[in-house]
Amino acid sequence: MATDGESISMSLAVATCVAMALFYVLILYVPTVILRLPSASSYTEFMIRRFICAAICTVASLVFTAFILPIKSWEASYILGVYGIRKDHLWQGVVYPLLLTSLVYAGSLVLKLFTLLESWKENGGGCSSFNYIRSFFQTIPASVLTSASNVSVWRNFIVAPVTEELVFRSCMIPLLLCAGFRINTAIFLCPVLFSLAHLNHFREMYIRHNRSYLRASLIVGLQLGYTVIFGAYASFLFIRTGHLAAPLFAHIFCNYMGLPVLYANGKGLVSAAFLGGVVGFVLLLFPLTKPLMYNDSTNDCPCWLGYCLWN
């Protein structure tokens, strides 16, 4: 293990990051290709296998990263802090990045409001609307229980965001920064590696969903473009705040919302809201992610904390 004053080589950092990205994808095929297990009998079993593989990859990446980084203490709180897992300034690390991210979805949120109002009108307003609202809240417990047993919900909102942010943000960014890469380079290099973890979607589209080669390429190409953009934003949040919670909750929110709605037929306000939200996002990007809002000090930081260099 290196000491706190040492650094790591750029070649070692890049090789480690590439290896972790490939491992994150290839381990998904271990059950059938290497262990020779029979094909999953159900979608639930298939996803549970993938959850286990992703968890193993994540733990291995965290341990390997800890031995490469110039860490001076093995105390749990110190190690967790290296990965951005902290309890101090937690509400700031969740709320402010979520508010910032929601600005990009202003059009989507306005469209949802229109849908809610139309539903209210269809129910006649007044007492009928209160009955509708009461009925809605009564269905929440059942919806929660249904979601808790839905593997797709676990994949989209728990397993994928947590494992991806731990591997591609908590592990890779400290490695790149301690290797001497510039902050901007780390921000845009991680998303490229992040997109590699989604290349297996082409196989799923082409083989499992029986898409044509061209259609599968277009769909996956769009997904890769989106993951690169989001990955850069998530890396930006992680470096600026020093909090894993910032990109993690932004990731979950984006998975829930999907692609931002740019326009809707007959609803010009949706487009106006989207444009206004984008302008607000650009204007508030740096003010809402000031390092001092999320940290007690921005001086004398270890090499893996980039916010000291970007205060």
Swiss-Prot record:
It is found in: Endoplasmic reticulum membrane. GO terms for biological process: CAAX-box protein maturation; CAAX-box protein processing; protein processing. The active site is at E164, H198. It comes from the Eukaryota. Keywords: Endoplasmic reticulum, Hydrolase, Membrane, Protease, Transmembrane, Transmembrane helix. InterPro entries: Rce1, Rce1/LyrA-like_dom. The keyword Transmembrane helix applies. It catalyses: Hydrolyzes the peptide bond -P2-(S-farnesyl or geranylgeranyl)C-P1'-P2'-P3'-COOH where P1' and P2' are amino acids with aliphatic sidechains and P3' is any C-terminal residue. Its main location: endoplasmic reticulum. One of its GO terms (molecular function) is endopeptidase activity. Pfam families: Rce1-like (PF02517). PANTHER family: CAAX PRENYL PROTEASE 2 (PTHR13046:SF0), PROTEASE U48 CAAX PRENYL PROTEASE RCE1 (PTHR13046). Protease involved in the processing of a variety of prenylated proteins containing the C-terminal CAAX motif, where C is a cysteine modified with an isoprenoid lipid, A is an aliphatic amino acid and X is any C-terminal amino acid. Proteolytically removes the C-terminal three residues of farnesylated and geranylated proteins, leaving the prenylated cysteine as the new C-terminus. The substrate specificity is only partially overlapping with that of FACE1. CAAX processing is likely required for subcellular targeting of prenylated proteins to the plasma membrane. This is CAAX prenyl protease 2. The lineage of its organism: Eukaryota, Viridiplantae, Streptophyta, Embryophyta, Tracheophyta. The gene is FACE2.
